């Protein structure tokens, strides 16, 4: 068993050197059904992004949906890894991967146990900002890694809570994690870069303490399912 096709246009940087090993079979949100059919796969693995196409894809091959549960993020990622181990007859490697990741998580938790600063995660997208906290797609930062969320109630929707400059200052995180969605999808955005160059941002504790941290956007946005 081997992977023969994927959405190569949206490969995260750490997998980019492998892109030419696979046929391009569409995007993260829309499959190229003809290209998939030509590959004659024995199995098609999709995420929630492609659920609307599941019935159509099942005409080509059986479909397995690997998704994540934001209320039990790490638990669902472990389940996905185990499932992939079974599919590709690599159960032992899957178990080893889970053990390694658990060790990394425990290492981070040992450090965050001594951090009391309040944390917010901010997603930048074509010049707009969305805030995320516990119970969200980035809730792993708080619920598994142990960072302390801000006191403000943040809507835990898939796309986060829209926030402006005044709102960000009112929340006033002491640590701000930033994920650039536009960059994750392969496009540089001057609008996004300019979002954090603002007097309101400069007044936040996160800025004053030099704790605005840019996360690897493609890793956090594209690879969230493990």
Question: Which ranges hold each PLM region?
Answer:
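Ligand-binding pocket segment of bilobal, Venus flytrap-like solute-binding proteins
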Residues: 140, 158-185
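Proline-aspartate-enriched helix->loop->beta-strand connector
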Residues: 38-46, 62, 168, 172-177
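Alpha-helical, coiled-coil/dimerization segments enriched in small aliphatic residues
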Residues: 10-13, 131-161
């Amino acid at each position: 068993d081997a992977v023969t096709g994927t959405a190569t246009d949206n490969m995260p940087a750490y997998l980019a050197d492998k892109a030419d090993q696979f046929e391009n079979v569409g995007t993260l949100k829309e499959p190229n059904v003809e290209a998939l059919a030509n590959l004659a796969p024995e199995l098609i693995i999709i995420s929630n992004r492609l659920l609307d196409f599941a019935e159509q894809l099942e005409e080509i091959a059986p479909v397995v949906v690997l998704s994540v549960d934001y209320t039990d993020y790490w638990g669902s990622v472990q389940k996905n890894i185990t499932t992939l181990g079974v599919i590709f007859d690599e159960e032992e490697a899957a178990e080893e991967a889970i053990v390694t990741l658990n060790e990394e998580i425990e290492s981070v938790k040992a450090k965050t146990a001594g951090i009391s600063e309040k944390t917010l995660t901010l997603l930048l997208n074509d010049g707009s900002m969305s805030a995320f906290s516990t119970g969200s797609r980035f809730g792993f930062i708080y619920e598994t890694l142990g960072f302390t969320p801000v006191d403000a109630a943040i809507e835990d929707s898939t796309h986060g809570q829209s926030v402006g400059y005044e709102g960000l200052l009112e929340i006033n995180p002491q640590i701000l994690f930033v994920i650039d969605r536009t960059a994750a999808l392969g496009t540089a955005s001057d609008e996004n870069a300019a979002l954090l160059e603002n007097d309101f941002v400069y007044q936040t504790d996160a800025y004053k303490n030099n704790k605005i941290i840019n996360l690897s956007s493609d890793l956090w946005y594209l690879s969230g399912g493990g």
